[in-house]
Amino acid sequence: MSARTPYIGITGIVTAGDIHALRTLAWKAPPPFGYRWMAGVLVSAKTLAGGATTNARYPRFADVPALLEELGDDTRTWPVVHFNCREGLAGHLRTLAGLEAMRGLQLNVQNPDRGEVAAFKRDRPDVEFILQVNAAAADESGALTPDSIRRYIDRYDGVADFALVDASAGRGTAIDLAVA
């Protein structure tokens, strides 16, 4: 892990209205000293291919570059793509690398191939990589423990800038805070 600026994340940016609300928040309630606001734009393999989704938190992929550019115009926000797929990660990463205004990438993927992530980082050293620590980090019994989380994170040493413990995998369910 690198010594990057920590962040407080807000995800689900879809519209100009969302950006305005985030900017209002950033102006009226700046993050604690030493932190920054992360502005997350959700992208899936389906939306990346131009498909629609019923989840209102995913913008059309055609709108993503403009959202990221507008977020990047404000120094108080850090534009991050949260990406999920089940297969074809290397090809998807090549496409995502073309998002010039993206400054962070969180892969909501179980066991992303370290070599594919490292190749992405070589192509886009300006993009900070967030490793989602999800169910793939569980130990043999299926439990997330501090040791199993540490082992999972260690596999991405040198490529992950941050690790986000997300045992709910984006579903918002409670986790054991003693583990987190």
Where are these regions (language model features)?
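Short, acidic/polar
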Residues: 19-25, 86-97, 141-155
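N-terminal cationic-hydrophobic initiation segments that often serve targeting/anchoring roles
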Residues: 23-26, 30, 68-72, 96-97, ...
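SEC14/CRAL-TRIO lipid-binding/transfer domains and related phosphoinositide-recognition modules
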Residues: 3, 7-28, 46-62, 66, ...
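Short linear motifs at secondary-structure transitions and domain/linker junctions
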Residues: 17, 52-59, 81, 104-107, ...
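Hydrophobic faces of well-ordered beta-strands that scaffold small-molecule active sites
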Residues: 4-14, 31-50, 75-83, 103-107, ...
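N-terminal active-site wall of soluble small-molecule enzyme domains
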Residues: 46-100, 111-116
